[in-house]
């Protein structure tokens, strides 16, 4: 008898990093919802059969979705609602007008009553206001009958070549969730992730210039022999001259002191460290440079750092693609969570 595939609804799905991790663990994502069409175009391009809906979750009625698309039963709801409205000014923060997107996630859980939910967010959501927000989130879901567990996970503990921390809340009906143990003893380094990708651009659909050099590269290339999204940025000669002064793993402090103020943010002129996992990939990619080449990472390099397989192709302008990658949950970390959930359900 075939093993049951648990069904998933992904809210605030973006391009689909969380969805991908759950699919890798054997879940079946039935629907994904977001209001950014660029990310949804990428989501649809990489998945046939998943309904990817452009809708404003702020005012979306779960019953409408259930009726319109025949979704009567959802096993797991996943997603990362934006929580920019969370502040620590008062005790009713969670009911603040600006936190309606978070409340919409709660509303969907209340309507569908899934076996489990997984919600991800920024790590400091646990400590803001001495834990007021964390406690309010736990209460919201406890009132719906869930036992809520939470933890800050480090992506590099799960084979992602990136030191990215995310707060994860998991709710189950009858037990606490046991978060996954580390899946790697030695972290995957930036060199492991990127060393087979060339300095210059590759036309979409061209062959890889070299064979994979390590296990991570073999895994990330699995099933594909063509490269996509590896277009290198053309920096000014002056930018190239300045970054050339910064060594592997260095930052602006490696420059002459009179050049420290050339860019206004403290992370400017930072190079990846080839011997370690990368720092957190952001949505702009304007200040972080390759450990060896005098340029910012390509979209494919950033996707590798996030643990997206090379078979996952990003659509849209370069700026949009970078934002899609930077906003995503690393699929390998999502897989570790999903795999653990699969065992428990």
Enumerate the language-model features and the residues they cover:
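Core alpha/beta nucleotide-donor-binding catalytic domains of modification enzymes
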Residues: 2-113, 123-127, 132-134
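Proline-centered helix-kink/hinge sites
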Residues: 48, 81-82, 114, 161, ...
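Conserved beta-strand termini and adjacent loop/short-helix elements that scaffold enzyme active sites
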Residues: 55, 151-153, 317
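Class I S-adenosyl-L-methionine
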Residues: 63-73, 84, 88-262
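Short connector loops/turns at beta-strand edges and beta->alpha or beta->beta junctions
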Residues: 82-84, 174, 286, 310-311
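C-terminal target-recognition/interaction regions appended to catalytic cores
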Residues: 217-345
């Amino acid at each position: 008898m075939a093993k049951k595939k648990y069904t998933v609804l992904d809210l605030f799905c973006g391009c689909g990093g969380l969805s991908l991790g759950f699919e890798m663990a054997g879940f079946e994502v039935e629907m994904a919802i977001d209001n950014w069409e660029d990310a949804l175009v990428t989501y649809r391009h990489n998945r046939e059969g998943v309904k990817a809906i452009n809708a404003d979750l702020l005012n979306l009625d779960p019953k409408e979705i259930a009726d319109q698309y025949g979704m009567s039963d959802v096993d797991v709801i996943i997603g990362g609602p934006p929580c920019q409205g969370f502040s620590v000014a008062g005790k009713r923060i969670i009911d603040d007008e600006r936190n309606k997107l978070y409340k919409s996630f709660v509303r969907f859980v209340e309507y569908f009553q899934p076996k489990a939910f997984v919600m991800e967010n920024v790590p400091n959501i646990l400590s803001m206001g001495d834990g007021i927000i964390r406690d309010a989130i736990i209460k919201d879901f406890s009132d719906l009958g869930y036992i809520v567990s939470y933890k800050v996970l480090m992506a590099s503990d799960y084979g992602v070549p990136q030191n990215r921390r995310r707060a994860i809340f998991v709710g189950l009906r009858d037990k606490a969730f046991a978060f996954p143990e580390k899946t790697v003893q030695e972290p995957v380094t930036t060199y492991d992730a990127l060393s087979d990708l060339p300095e210059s651009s590759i036309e979409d659909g061209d062959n890889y210039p070299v064979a994979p050099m390590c296990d991570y590269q073999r895994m990330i290339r699995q099933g594909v022999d063509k490269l996509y999204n590896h277009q290198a940025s053309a920096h000014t000669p002056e930018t190239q001259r300045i970054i050339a002064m910064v060594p592997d793993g260095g930052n602006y402090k490696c420059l002459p002191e009179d050049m420290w103020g050339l860019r206004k943010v403290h992370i400017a002129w930072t190079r990846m460290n080839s011997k370690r996992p990368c720092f957190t990939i952001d949505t702009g990619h304007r200040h972080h440079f390759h450990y060896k080449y005098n340029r910012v990472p390509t979209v494919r390099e950033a996707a590798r750092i996030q643990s997206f397989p090379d078979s996952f192709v990003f659509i849209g302008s370069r700026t949009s693609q970078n934002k899609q990658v930077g906003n995503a949950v690393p699929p390998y970390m999502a897989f570790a969570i999903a795999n653990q959930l699969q065992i428990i359900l």
